[in-house]
Amino acid sequence: MNIRPLHDRVIIKRMEEERTTAGGIVIPDSATEKPVRGEVIAVGKGKILENGEVRALDVKVGDKVLFGKYSGTEIKVDGQEVLVMREEDIMGVLEG
């Protein structure tokens, strides 16, 4: 992917949610919400602090993250839909 986010922004590819319930019921596309989990595919250099220093981001490429339903801005790059958001919009990193 040919995009490099600036400053404290990250590029996230949404992870598909499970479309079948535990009971085996298949959920149609029209009934599913957009996933709120994704994988970080690019990160900026860091947040510029008031004193001019750059603080490195806590997330890194490959991290699986959680974010709000309305977080970020959807864009299309190389035919692929991704989200651009600030690191502060990420709620957590999935471990393990």
UniProtKB/Swiss-Prot annotation:
Record keywords, A-Z: Chaperone, Cytoplasm
Major place of residence: cytoplasm
Name of protein: Co-chaperonin GroES
Molecular function in Gene Ontology: ATP binding; metal ion binding; protein folding chaperone; protein-folding chaperone binding; unfolded protein binding
Function: Together with the chaperonin GroEL, plays an essential role in assisting protein folding. The GroEL-GroES system forms a nano-cage that allows encapsulation of the non-native substrate proteins and provides a physical environment optimized to promote and accelerate protein folding. GroES binds to the apical surface of the GroEL ring, thereby capping the opening of the GroEL channel.
Entries under InterPro entries matching the protein: Chaperonin_GroES (IPR020818), Chaperonin_GroES_sf (IPR037124), Chaprnonin_Cpn10_CS (IPR018369), GroES-like_sf (IPR011032)
Cellular compartments annotated: Cytoplasm
GO cellular component terms, semicolon-separated: cytoplasm
SMART domains xref list: Cpn10
Pfam families: Cpn10 (PF00166)
Family classification: Belongs to the GroES chaperonin family.
Membrane spanning stretches: none
Complex and partners: Heptamer of 7 subunits arranged in a ring. Interacts with the chaperonin GroEL.
One GO BP annotation of this record: chaperone cofactor-dependent protein refolding
Keyword Chaperone in annotation: yes
